[in-house]
């Protein structure tokens, strides 16, 4: 069995992408001195260094990297060593211009950025094998080596190529996936619009067409592109396993739905030795700490509930959004420790030292342009001390309460053209249901539709347009065996080939929900509907309505107006020992909370309404009865959290975000510890006070 934790790293990981090739070697000594001051335990190296490591085909220059790894080892810093295959050198593209990717419109990308790769290119695969093999042979036994980091952020910025090499590869993939051209015709429904194929050679990638292309073909191409990238990862991984046994292999995911939509992370999670993730706050008006928690929960779920590692996030502002605000004092540590609460075994950043040149020179870093006399640096040092104080949580697992079903294949299918309402967004529904669960202080596991759900009292399906028959059976068995299920509209509609399930909607869910949908009637942008329910309570919906016909389900809320006035809007179906709820419109936040609360009662989940809003409460537990409570106060008010048992506060008084650092002189709390200076090991009992902006971590006594 492969190693699943960084080799030789016995603390929480703390550090970042280190790009010393951007600086004179005279700076390296200062770097390692500052790393020791900050408590850095690991850095990622060499991710974009292919042109320096292999300046011409087959000639390797590892001298500078030898000196660097020796220096890091001398100072006790572990190394996450990259295979630099995300950025082939200019000489490679000069020799193989066909390896540059082609868009669906037929435009070939040019050299001069990163990630410009056709993953079907035989020349690219051979070159990647060469540099990976050379690195593995040279550094496989280096004492600083803790982890292999293959490529970088697969799936962005290029998720698919449409060149002739990919066309040939796609045809081979289709034969492996379907077995025959006749099976492809059946799966794609090529009888529609006269698209029948007589041979594989007639099939091309779904390039630009006069109108909407075949949706099943487009869906298969998404699968093919993801599988092709995964083939290349496996090729590098297998080389590293063979030549450097005992060193785990990873690649950095981007699981946040706001940051990558082209990778099936359920499949990728099975390929890496250690799941790692990059996460960046999106300045799109959403509550960023909720998006962060969701990404962390999704990453942990991709890891099967096991500990994972945050490999990149930012100390402050980024540089690639329309507006890139700085993080407020204390926010960096709250972000970092929120990831740790939800299963990460540390907090790594992009990057160690802020670049003077290049596309990301305005992206924040651990060592900013202003050096060490800056708020960011002081917060970095404080966070390093805080992570050292939390070393004992290593190896524990986050404790979940409920599950949310998510499937990338369904997302891909729903995002294809010509759907009933383009305003129905799977990501928006997932975000909204997650936010409702978050505000009810429930920790979420994400789950594949065909996975074992028996551990969860409540399972939510926010958007599952594509559902296999196996997934439908799985959800039915879950409810029959005592589970509580909540399903949102436009779920269970098509099978794995984007073909509508036979019979009335929602085909894969009719039995478990006890209803059929005769027709849906999407709403216009300015339309709202009122929904009346128990005790005169009213809910509000928009975007979508349906004509629901109960077939065993009871009507709980009814449309009071709109196209489906008088008909069921929210239903409840008792099946076996469990209950299935169905929501046929897009509810606003208050209305959605009412449904989740009612379903939670069915599931026997105790209300946590006494906990304050925007105070994040998460537990980790491990062998030997170890239990830890993380309390992160994202609000501007001090908060009190009731404790069922006594415990011991673990974090030191590492003051960050004090009044001197804030523009208006108002304390925003501390990065770790508390504003009042709780010393390490202070007993707490009955309640835990968490100042505004602060983080507390308690070792519970039982």
Label each residue range with its predicted role.
Residues 2-27, 32-42:
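An acidic-aromatic substrate-binding cleft motif
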Residues 9-14, 39-41, 73-79, 141-146, ...:
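Short, well-ordered coil/turn segments that N-cap beta-strands
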Residues 30-37, 42-108, 136, 235-243, ...:
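Aromatic-lined substrate-binding rim segments of carbohydrate-active enzymes
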Residues 16, 35, 43, 72, ...:
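Conserved, mostly hydrophobic/aromatic
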Residues 105-274, 278-292:
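Polysaccharide-binding and catalytic clefts of secreted carbohydrate-active enzymes
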Residues 13-25, 46-63, 110-129, 151-159, ...:
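The substrate-binding groove and active-site-proximal loops of carbohydrate-active enzymes
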Residues 200-203, 207, 246, 273, ...:
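Carbohydrate-binding surfaces of carbohydrate-active enzymes
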